[in-house]
From Swiss-Prot:
Belongs to the ADISSP family. Coiled coil: none annotated. Its main location: secreted. One of its GO terms (cellular component) is extracellular space. It is found in: Secreted. This is Adipose-secreted signaling protein. May be involved in thermogenesis and glucose homeostasis. Keywords: Secreted.
Protein backbone atom coordinates (compact mmCIF):
# COMPACT_ATOMS: atom_id res chain seq x y z
CA UNK A 1 0.00 0.00 0.00
CA UNK A 2 2.85 2.40 0.79
CA UNK A 3 4.33 1.72 -2.64
CA UNK A 4 1.08 2.69 -4.34
CA UNK A 5 1.03 6.11 -2.63
CA UNK A 6 4.66 6.85 -3.37
CA UNK A 7 3.95 8.64 -6.67
CA UNK A 8 0.63 10.17 -5.61
CA UNK A 9 0.43 13.96 -5.63
CA UNK A 10 -1.00 15.78 -2.63
CA UNK A 11 -4.36 17.49 -2.97
CA UNK A 12 -4.22 21.26 -3.12
CA UNK A 13 -6.99 23.40 -1.71
CA UNK A 14 -7.94 26.87 -2.91
CA UNK A 15 -6.29 30.02 -1.58
CA UNK A 16 -8.34 32.40 0.55
CA UNK A 17 -7.50 35.98 1.38
CA UNK A 18 -8.49 37.90 4.46
CA UNK A 19 -11.68 39.96 4.26
CA UNK A 20 -9.74 43.24 4.38
CA UNK A 21 -7.52 42.40 1.40
CA UNK A 22 -7.08 45.48 -0.84
CA UNK A 23 -8.43 45.60 -4.38
CA UNK A 24 -6.19 44.57 -7.26
CA UNK A 25 -4.12 47.45 -8.58
CA UNK A 26 -4.00 49.29 -5.26
CA UNK A 27 -0.56 50.66 -4.40
CA UNK A 28 0.88 48.59 -1.60
CA UNK A 29 4.15 48.66 0.28
CA UNK A 30 5.67 45.95 2.38
CA UNK A 31 5.89 46.89 6.04
CA UNK A 32 7.76 44.88 8.63
CA UNK A 33 6.97 44.96 12.29
CA UNK A 34 10.00 46.28 14.19
CA UNK A 35 9.81 43.35 16.60
CA UNK A 36 10.11 40.76 13.81
CA UNK A 37 13.83 41.28 13.31
CA UNK A 38 16.71 43.13 14.85
CA UNK A 39 17.96 46.04 12.79
CA UNK A 40 21.48 46.01 14.21
CA UNK A 41 24.64 44.15 13.25
CA UNK A 42 24.57 40.73 14.95
CA UNK A 43 27.73 39.57 16.75
CA UNK A 44 27.77 36.00 18.02
CA UNK A 45 30.55 34.03 19.66
CA UNK A 46 31.12 30.58 18.18
CA UNK A 47 31.91 27.40 20.13
CA UNK A 48 35.62 27.74 19.27
CA UNK A 49 35.75 31.24 20.82
CA UNK A 50 35.85 33.09 17.48
CA UNK A 51 33.17 35.56 16.40
CA UNK A 52 30.66 35.74 13.55
CA UNK A 53 29.46 39.22 12.60
CA UNK A 54 26.33 39.31 10.41
CA UNK A 55 25.98 42.66 8.63
CA UNK A 56 22.83 41.89 6.61
CA UNK A 57 22.14 42.76 2.98
CA UNK A 58 24.60 44.87 0.99
CA UNK A 59 24.72 45.90 -2.67
CA UNK A 60 27.40 44.71 -5.05
CA UNK A 61 30.23 47.12 -5.95
CA UNK A 62 29.53 49.36 -2.95
CA UNK A 63 31.83 50.25 -0.06
CA UNK A 64 30.57 50.19 3.50
CA UNK A 65 31.79 51.31 6.88
CA UNK A 66 30.79 48.70 9.45
CA UNK A 67 30.89 49.36 13.20
CA UNK A 68 30.26 46.74 15.85
CA UNK A 69 31.23 45.88 19.41
CA UNK A 70 32.92 42.71 20.58
CA UNK A 71 32.39 41.54 24.14
CA UNK A 72 35.48 41.30 26.36
CA UNK A 73 37.77 38.38 25.54
CA UNK A 74 39.76 37.47 28.65
CA UNK A 75 42.82 36.07 26.84
CA UNK A 76 43.21 39.18 24.63
CA UNK A 77 43.21 41.76 27.39
CA UNK A 78 42.48 45.45 26.86
CA UNK A 79 45.07 46.23 24.17
CA UNK A 80 44.38 44.52 20.85
CA UNK A 81 45.32 45.16 17.23
CA UNK A 82 44.39 43.79 13.82
CA UNK A 83 46.81 41.35 12.20
CA UNK A 84 47.52 42.47 8.61
CA UNK A 85 45.88 40.01 6.19
CA UNK A 86 46.11 39.93 2.39
CA UNK A 87 42.48 40.86 1.70
CA UNK A 88 41.32 43.75 -0.44
CA UNK A 89 37.70 43.55 0.66
CA UNK A 90 37.93 44.02 4.43
CA UNK A 91 40.14 46.58 6.14
CA UNK A 92 40.14 47.39 9.86
CA UNK A 93 39.95 51.18 10.32
CA UNK A 94 40.00 51.42 14.12
CA UNK A 95 39.81 49.44 17.34
CA UNK A 96 38.70 51.26 20.48
CA UNK A 97 38.74 49.78 23.97
CA UNK A 98 35.44 50.19 25.82
CA UNK A 99 34.24 49.41 29.33
CA UNK A 100 32.65 46.21 28.00
CA UNK A 101 34.91 44.93 25.22
CA UNK A 102 36.06 46.66 22.06
CA UNK A 103 34.48 48.77 19.34
CA UNK A 104 35.62 47.78 15.84
CA UNK A 105 35.25 49.93 12.74
CA UNK A 106 36.11 48.43 9.35
CA UNK A 107 35.67 49.10 5.65
CA UNK A 108 34.05 46.39 3.55
CA UNK A 109 33.83 46.21 -0.25
CA UNK A 110 31.01 44.05 -1.63
CA UNK A 111 32.87 42.65 -4.65
CA UNK A 112 30.56 39.81 -5.78
CA UNK A 113 27.03 38.65 -5.10
CA UNK A 114 26.01 35.88 -2.74
CA UNK A 115 26.73 35.12 0.90
CA UNK A 116 30.28 36.37 1.44
CA UNK A 117 32.53 35.81 4.42
CA UNK A 118 35.68 37.84 5.01
CA UNK A 119 37.84 37.42 8.06
CA UNK A 120 40.05 39.51 10.28
CA UNK A 121 42.31 38.41 13.09
CA UNK A 122 42.54 40.45 16.26
CA UNK A 123 45.58 39.81 18.44
CA UNK A 124 46.65 40.83 21.91
CA UNK A 125 49.41 43.45 22.03
CA UNK A 126 50.73 41.96 25.29
CA UNK A 127 50.50 38.19 24.59
CA UNK A 128 51.92 36.92 21.28
CA UNK A 129 49.89 33.71 21.41
CA UNK A 130 46.47 35.26 22.10
CA UNK A 131 44.27 36.03 19.10
CA UNK A 132 40.68 35.70 17.93
CA UNK A 133 39.25 35.32 14.43
CA UNK A 134 36.31 37.55 13.45
CA UNK A 135 34.32 36.53 10.35
CA UNK A 136 32.21 39.26 8.73
CA UNK A 137 29.29 37.74 6.81
CA UNK A 138 27.23 39.71 4.30
CA UNK A 139 24.53 38.78 1.82
CA UNK A 140 25.41 40.78 -1.29
CA UNK A 141 22.68 41.59 -3.82
CA UNK A 142 23.36 42.23 -7.49
CA UNK A 143 22.75 45.68 -8.95
CA UNK A 144 19.32 44.74 -10.35
CA UNK A 145 17.73 43.80 -7.02
CA UNK A 146 17.14 47.23 -5.51
CA UNK A 147 18.72 48.97 -2.59
CA UNK A 148 18.84 47.05 0.69
CA UNK A 149 17.89 48.58 4.03
CA UNK A 150 21.14 48.84 5.96
CA UNK A 151 21.41 47.65 9.52
CA UNK A 152 22.36 50.02 12.32
CA UNK A 153 26.16 50.09 12.32
CA UNK A 154 26.45 49.78 8.52
CA UNK A 155 26.93 52.91 6.40
CA UNK A 156 27.45 53.11 2.64
CA UNK A 157 30.52 55.23 1.88
CA UNK A 158 30.60 54.98 -1.91
CA UNK A 159 30.52 52.83 -5.00
CA UNK A 160 33.17 51.00 -6.96
CA UNK A 161 33.36 51.57 -10.68
CA UNK A 162 32.15 48.62 -12.70
CA UNK A 163 34.29 47.78 -15.68
CA UNK A 164 32.20 47.51 -18.83
CA UNK A 165 33.97 46.57 -22.05
CA UNK A 166 31.57 48.77 -24.05
CA UNK A 167 32.83 51.84 -22.18
CA UNK A 168 36.45 51.13 -23.05
CA UNK A 169 38.42 53.54 -25.24
CA UNK A 170 40.32 50.67 -26.78
CA UNK A 171 39.09 49.82 -30.29
CA UNK A 172 41.13 46.70 -30.88
CA UNK A 173 43.92 46.04 -33.33
CA UNK A 174 43.81 47.73 -36.75
Amino acid sequence: MAAAKKGAKPKVAGVRFAAGFPEEGAHNHVHFDEQLHDSVVMVSQQEDGNFLVKVGFLKILHKYEISFSLPPVQRLGKSICAVPLPTLNLKVLSITSQAEGHSIKCEYTAHKEGVLKEEMILASETNDKAFVKVVVQARVLDRHHGTPMLLEGVRCTGTELEYDSEQSDWHGFD
